[in-house]
Amino acid sequence: MDAAQADKAASSPVEAHAEVAALLASGAVGEAQAALDAALARWPKNPKLVLVKGEVLAKASPVQAATHYASLTSDPALAPWAASRLADLLPLPTATAEEAVALMEAVCDGAVDRPIKEPILDALLEAGDDAAKARLIEIAGSKSKIFKYESKLAVARTESGDFGGAIAVLANARAEGRLSVHAAVLYADLLASSDRLADSIALLEEIYAQNPDHADLSRRLTMMLQRARDFDRAAEVFEQAVARWPQDWMLVYRLNRLPIAHDRYERVLALLLEGAGSALKTNERLRFQAALAVLHADDPTRGFELMEAKFTPPVSILAVPVQKALKTRDAKAWRSASRLVDDRTKEVQVTRSPDPRGTVVITTGITFGNLPLAFIDAIFAAQGFNVIYLRDFGKRVYLRGVASLGASEEETIAVLKRMAGELGGKRLIAMGSSSGGFSAMRVGALMGADVCVSLSGQTALASYLDATRVSAWNPNFFVKVQMEREGDLPFDLVPVLSRPSKTKFLQFYGADDEEDTRQALRLKGIANVLLIPVRGVGDHFVVDHMIADGSFDALLKELGT
């Protein structure tokens, strides 16, 4: 600096800042830049000068100015001012993906408080293409310590199949006290899908104890306890839910499928009916499910009464076939003719006929169609069949066997063949509805049954989920991922049904149900397979229609000859 320049130079940082600001205000950007450079050479760490540099840069390049401000956020003393000025520059439509990533990293690493950090991150996440946004979410979710972005990252990793990475994000958020109740449900699903069922249950128990009025927590905990076969605790949680939400028809729907001891079932049902009150008259979904629940209990007459009134769409689609099926016998006849007192906590139950025409192995869930198993047994009893009722609490459509019969599918098949031989009867039949239909075809084929009957059964379970929406909040997404991870399991019926065999395979399906038709037609052309479309049926419960029109009784008569 020569003598003349020294005479003109500012005598203090304050004076220099004022000079630069005045030059900027007058539009003399070049002179402002020169004055600032001279001032910074003398006072390189002066806060006002460092900050006003961003204003100078912004005149030529807002992106350069934003980068400058972002770099200043590492200084706790400057961070509030720099972050505020950075926020004023956003959005930056001309920023490249790399520039946006650099800004995101600097702000996340900087000493920026959440009230100003969050709008900056939100604005940055709006920029760029999907690939850039994925990188930005990765940075925000792993570095910001703001749960909104951690949640986004956990969801993104989940939907990309990186369950371990998603678990790591949520575990860290939980350890640092940021995990939301909603995200805890996702965390539990991820743990359960990663062979950590005990950890999933422990998490849900802890969060549920803190949030007993959160319905989704109650549902998930009940479901996980069922999967772990802790039926007593599952029933406790379910009973608490009924006490809180007795008019929730979905609760009654789940009650109809809950593995629960008979005495507790009666108590829960009484609690539910008492709490439902007048909603039983005004809510058709609730009335239909409550009617099925009562039929499962020891009061078929009341179940018939609840089913008596008219149902309208969409409830009528399921309810009307059940109404018609029930009318094929009176209420007392259904119960008196049945040999089964259904214990839903048992995997294997057997009913016998004195002079059996054959033995039927039924691979079922909780129900067979929409009627209680005890009612179904009345039909088989009338036709003189022994029945072996199976449940698969492992939720693997019997492909890993039934635990109480064997440690594998092979061991289970061997025990079932022995049981069927001991029960007697000249014919061995396997039968199931929906996923139970898939299982009946496979189990029957492996047992060497005379006939296998699938009622609206899938033929390729994985393809049944082809249209599953990829979403961390879609339960079927986890089902599909789990199936893909268990690729060694034979989820396709075509190979086993294509083997040389004397077994006859009958595939019944609703002729007007698009997906069931697609599944059935996969078996077209296989020897010994007979495809039987049921005309006028456009839903998944073909068995209810067949019971209603008498064709199910006719089928059993034919099978027994």
Model-predicted segments: where are they?
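Short coil turns that delineate tetratricopeptide repeat
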Residues: 10-11, 44, 77, 111-112, ...
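TPR alpha-solenoid repeat register
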Residues: 15, 49, 82, 116-117, ...
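Structural motif corresponding to the intra-repeat A-B loop/turn of tetratricopeptide repeats
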Residues: 26, 59-60, 93-94, 127, ...
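Single-residue signature of alpha-solenoid repeat helices
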Residues: 32, 65, 99-100, 132-133, ...
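Short, surface-exposed "cap/lid" segments of acyl-processing enzymes
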Residues: 334-385, 392-396
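The feature captures the conserved acid-bearing segment of alpha/beta-hydrolase catalytic domains
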Residues: 471-533, 539-544, 550-560
